[in-house]
Amino acid sequence: MRATRFPLATLKETPADAEVISHQLMLRAGMIRRLASGLYSWTPLGLRVLRKVEGLVRDEMDRAGALELLMPAVQPAELWQESGRWEQYGPELLRLKDRHMREFCFGPTHEEVITDYVRREVKSYRQLPVNYYQIQTKFRDEIRPRFGVMRAREFLMKDAYSFHVDEDSLKETYARMHEAYTRIFTRCGLDFRAVLADTGSIGGNASHEFHVLADSGEDAIAFSDVSDYAANVELAEAVAPATERAAPGEAMRLVDTPNARTIADLVEQHGLAIEKTVKTLVVAAAEGAEAPLIALLVRGDHELNAIKAEKLPQVASPLRMATEEEIRAAIGAGPGSLGPVNLPIPCVVDRAVALMSDFGAGANIDGKHYFGINWERDLALPPVADLRNVVAGDPSPDGQGSLQIRRGIEVGHIFQLGRKYSEAMGATVLDEQGRSLVVTMGCYGIGVSRVVAAAIEQNHDAQGIIWPEALAPFTVALCPINAQKSQRLREAADALYERLLNAGFEVFYDDRGLRPGAMFADMELIGIPHRLVLGERGLDAGEIEYKGRRDTDTTQVALDGVLDFLRQRMNAAH
């Protein structure tokens, strides 16, 4: 493609409202342009990258045996009312009415539509399993769209839905989708992890998220430094320490702590090591529990895990922290002075707390703490559970290595849905005995447009984007120097351009006649992996200058061998 026919819209300055590097670079490189909050137009340059991701996704989905279709983006309310999600979904569901005042929504997902399709089209167990997918624009009315296409309101998504006679069949397809996703993100050139995840509002029995590792990621993920274990921090098990509880070394004593309202205050003012302190958090108890409130105890340097906490049978779900008024009414002290000694409400302690000795905690009297508390001597050990978020250095739950914590950008999510939608909507087939059987479902999503942003977050430098080979809008940039002043150079550059095209390279031929610095800056900003620079001196020597986007130095390459040289470099990149 000639630059004179493919105008670049690069920017020198970073837009003030762009918070993350991918948003900044996509705007500066001229890949996207904002239309309204959370709505972006993809320019020809950006669309080339988007289509690359889409092509890889389609290739691997087809390879895995999925069938592509296309469903309407606008969905009738009746389907969502059947599934129960019309009432459950919040304001992120864009609802609308047609001229006949019939209610619709702009689909954020398509579970209802595909289930309706299957209950009409699939009648026998012989037609199963089947896996349908589409690549389509979705809309979610995010309360605060941000980070460019990373969290836009309108986005391109690949969503797939599989249907089965039983759980075993679902697990087979789920495993194939896991493998397909692994191939997709590997081919995209991304450093990613597949992590155990919560099924969330979509529901189901098992779930994995695929996260691209990046400092700007919104999710914290924990993974082993030895094995393939990985999980969202919220779901990673905090393994109980292998050590035994140390014997008591101090007497329990009541200490005046009038200004210690937080763990940090306690550490700073009274010299306790933070790992020798305990936080007491009071939450609403489950309906029918022995008391309306229950206390959860974690070590002072640990954080309560809300997902783990609300899965306890004693705790109300969703998790609700007690108000100060409720706490004072039940305990007689404020939140900064709570602890397990003489606590008048039930409590559960974290595994790490159960192994503590000589620790400090609130005395359930305002402005007072007990120091030197020991289980079994000063009070009985309450029920023990895994209540906390894991931290870096914790043992991996699979027994192999230690956990590392990194930020991740979720780009894919796969679910074993079970029968949630098929039961609600009556999606059945006839089994071998001619009896009606409710089908079992799986669903599998990839944020196609989000992959583009995630790739940039992971692949950039001070000059701009560094595209992985498979995602680059063009693979080779051809930059003639001062070609407007030399017909000989123009003809040589034109001839090389044709050679490159005929050899199958995706070439961006910068024939704009810009000065070299401006031309090189644009090529680095938009991230083309391979740059060829042709000048009069090189032409005389039968050479061309080569520089890879990740290289610090240039290389002189013989003009007649440049095609083979490029092929070698590209093969090495894979």
From Swiss-Prot:
Cellular location(s): Cytoplasm
Entry's Gene Ontology cellular component terms: cytosol
SUPFAM superfamilies noted in UniProt: Class II aaRS ABD-related, Class II aaRS and biotin synthetases, YbaK/ProRS associated domain
Superkingdom of the organism of origin: Bacteria
Annotated GO biological process: prolyl-tRNA aminoacylation
Stored InterPro entries: aa-tRNA-synt_IIb, aa-tRNA-synth_II, aa-tRNA-synth_II/BPL/LPL, Anticodon-bd, Anticodon-bd_dom_sf, Pro-tRNA-ligase_IIa, Pro-tRNA-synth_IIa_bac-type, Pro-tRNA-Synthase_IIa_type1
Keywords: Aminoacyl-tRNA synthetase, ATP-binding, Cytoplasm, Ligase, Nucleotide-binding, Protein biosynthesis
GO MF terms, alphabetically ordered: aminoacyl-tRNA deacylase activity; ATP binding; proline-tRNA ligase activity
EC number from the UniProt entry: 6.1.1.15
Catalytic activity, as annotated: tRNA(Pro) + L-proline + ATP = L-prolyl-tRNA(Pro) + AMP + diphosphate
Main location: cytoplasm
Family according to the record: Belongs to the class-II aminoacyl-tRNA synthetase family. ProS type 1 subfamily.
Domain writeup: Consists of three domains: the N-terminal catalytic domain, the editing domain and the C-terminal anticodon-binding domain.
Subunit text: Homodimer.
PANTHER family found in the cross-reference section: MITOCHONDRIAL RIBOSOME PROTEIN L39/PROLYL-TRNA LIGASE FAMILY MEMBER, PROLINE--TRNA LIGASE
Role this protein plays: Catalyzes the attachment of proline to tRNA(Pro) in a two-step reaction: proline is first activated by ATP to form Pro-AMP and then transferred to the acceptor end of tRNA(Pro). As ProRS can inadvertently accommodate and process non-cognate amino acids such as alanine and cysteine, to avoid such errors it has two additional distinct editing activities against alanine. One activity is designated as 'pretransfer' editing and involves the tRNA(Pro)-independent hydrolysis of activated Ala-AMP.
Listed name of the protein: Proline--tRNA ligase
Organism of origin: Thioalkalivibrio sulfidiphilus (strain HL-EbGR7)
Taxonomy of the source species: Bacteria, Pseudomonadati, Pseudomonadota, Gammaproteobacteria, Chromatiales
The gene coding this protein: proS
